[in-house]
């Protein structure tokens, strides 16, 4: 037998109330007396219900007081509902039972006897009704125009006082409103359901109009056909832009999601695994709703444009593929324009080509080491190994880079620095060094000219001495010279001129061919000799 007693209300003696007839028959048939379980009134007792097991067998329960039958309310088909004399009005909060730990002390207690299978079915139905925002008749909560009361028999005995204080708190409703604003998706789901209902009503109305009279459909089809090519192109471009906007929204949402995951992982590394989930889940739900609303708005515009163009929904794969072809062309054109613009501004690298040389990161590390050791850019073996580890290159690659850098980069810089500091002196040295070979060349040329003059003088002397003997490169005597008069000055002048002609004509022939022309009869005679001219010069 189960009896309920109160603690802080006016107590008076009354007959106990039985939950079913079986317990009443057991109490009537039993003869053994037992002690009655009572709760004395006072402020020291907690303001909650105490469930007393059926142990009394007497006809009358004695005590300070029992609960009156007026405090117990039996709803038709709703189970037992008990209050302490006051109803707690709270804002509708559909997840008290599941989130705050409200559990039934004895779910099988009811006006009717229920099996455990029936209890499971009732619990499933109550969960579904709570998720749908409706009041569960079998639960302790009954919705009364947005307000309701919770039966305290649903609370745990250990947390009843705390829960009652929470439910009576003045901060409960603002907290519920804040959570509904940030997390709850119920309003938007209801709005989406209303939109779907409107769309279905519109579609059904349009179908009725098409079935009733074909004039409107023909007019609408005629309007879609009567579109000019310019208008059709404009609508097509608009549709392509809207489709690209949908792709951009999806891309941005994925980007946001990945960034949030990266941030959460970095936070969990510091704070612990799963510590970022309470923060990120709310933000993800909120942002996903914004993205979804934007995407739905763009989709509605696309649907309007399709209706203007007279296109269908494009559910089949062929139609979707036909839509993607012009959209891909548009995207390709846009990407090319952006790529050209970025290349002009220098924001993006050109297209990929086979890499020549080392990676830029490695080169930057090696160049930094070179400038740090600019006075002596010759790394040791240990330094080469260290640089190879830092750059991800091999030791030979590092050594080859430093060889090339010293030749192409370091040496020209040293030369420029030397020119800047010692530019005047180096120019003087260079001018002096350039003048010295010129002076030596001039001296050599002057000495050669002097030797040529001496040789010419000697040759003239040789030929002048030959005039006295009347023999020049020949063993035979010339009749003209023998018969001539030596005392005649005119004859002597002719002989000298002929000798000079022979000397001048010598330079026009080979080394071994010499020509002698007599001054008197101009007879030409040739002869060959193996001796050179300088052999005959004394």
From Swiss-Prot:
PANTHER family given in the database record: HOMEOBOX PROTEIN TRANSCRIPTION FACTORS (PTHR11850)
UniProt-listed PROSITE patterns: HOMEOBOX_1 (PS00027), HOMEOBOX_2 (PS50071)
Gene designation per UniProt: BLH10
Annotated Gene Ontology cellular component terms: nucleus
Keywords (A to Z) from UniProt: DNA-binding, Homeobox, Nucleus, Transcription, Transcription regulation
Region (Disordered): 201-223, 434-500
DNA-binding region ranges: 351-413
Primary localisation category: nucleus
Keyword Cell membrane recorded: no
Outcome after substituting residue 233 to D: In strain: cv. Ag-0, cv. Bs-1, cv. Chi-1, cv. Cvi-0, cv. Kas-1, cv. Ita-0, cv. Landsberg erecta, cv. Lisse, cv. Me-0, cv. Mt-0, cv. Oy-0
Ranges of Low complexity composition bias in the record: 438-460
UniProt xrefs under SUPFAM superfamilies: Homeodomain-like
Effect of mutating residue 236 to H: In strain: cv. Ag-0, cv. Bs-1, cv. Chi-1, cv. Cvi-0, cv. Kas-1, cv. Ita-0, cv. Landsberg erecta, cv. Lisse, cv. Me-0, cv. Mt-0, cv. Oy-0
Ranges of Polar residues composition bias in the record: 461-476, 487-497
Annotated spans, SR/KY domain: 169-185
Superkingdom classification of source: Eukaryota
Originating species: Arabidopsis thaliana (Mouse-ear cress)
Molecular functions (GO terms): DNA binding; DNA-binding transcription factor activity
InterPro entries found in the cross-reference section: HD (IPR001356), Homeodomain-like_sf (IPR009057), KN_HD (IPR008422), POX_dom (IPR006563), TALE_homeobox (IPR050224)
Subcellular location: Nucleus
Documented effect of changing residue 193 to S: In strain: cv. Ag-0, cv. Bs-1, cv. Chi-1, cv. Cvi-0, cv. Kas-1, cv. Ita-0, cv. Landsberg erecta, cv. Lisse, cv. Me-0, cv. Mt-0, cv. Oy-0
Family as reported in the entry's similarity comment: Belongs to the TALE/BELL homeobox family.
Protein name: BEL1-like homeodomain protein 10
Region ranges (BELL domain): 231-302
Subunit structure: Interacts with TLP1. May form heterodimeric complexes with TALE/KNOX proteins. Interacts with OFP1, OFP2, OFP4 and OFP5.
Lipoprotein as UniProt keyword: no
Domain comment (free text): The SR/KY and BELL domains are responsive for the interaction between the TALE/BELL proteins and the TALE/KNOX proteins.
